[in-house]
Amino acid sequence: GHFVALLEKESDEDSSLFKGDGVEHRQPQNKIPDELSDFIDKLNRGTLDFKVESKNISVRDSYVYLCSPLMPELKGLRTMRTGLLLGELKKNRFEPSQALAMALKSCDYTDVISLPENDERVVKYLKGETLDLPEFENNTSDGWNLFCVDGYPLGWGKFKNGTLKNKYLAGWRWM
């Protein structure tokens, strides 16, 4: 559930003890892992309305979040999520999240595979199958690709040698 607290100031005498704007701002994280920084570079080469900066990245356990630059330090507070889930760090690799795919436009990421809605491979993608996409082999780089239908993102796939390994969220797949 959600909880709310009302804080009430007792007197004006203690106000001289506070300096600044009263908000403790987040300190930059330690160095971002290489596998994550490569992915962030691809995001920043797209046409995002903003740049993803390392100071706005928060890593909790293995989950990577993009936080608002205005968000204060949350040290000591229990939070479910601290921003947009970018993905997860797993065994020396980064896997982007479905939430990130849904938050992007096709022009926001550099490696995009977009098919028309009437292509039979769209249904295969929605069912979680691996796709053969030989026509994208020369103009798409290997690695994480944003899979789109008519320019609208559906999810992620890992592209290599003309094959797209489906990373569509398992709970969303067609039966």
Regions found by a protein language model. Give the residues of each.
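Conserved beta strand-loop-helix elements of the APE1-like EEP
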Residues: H2-D12
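Polybasic, low-complexity RNA-engagement segments
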Residues: E10-M175
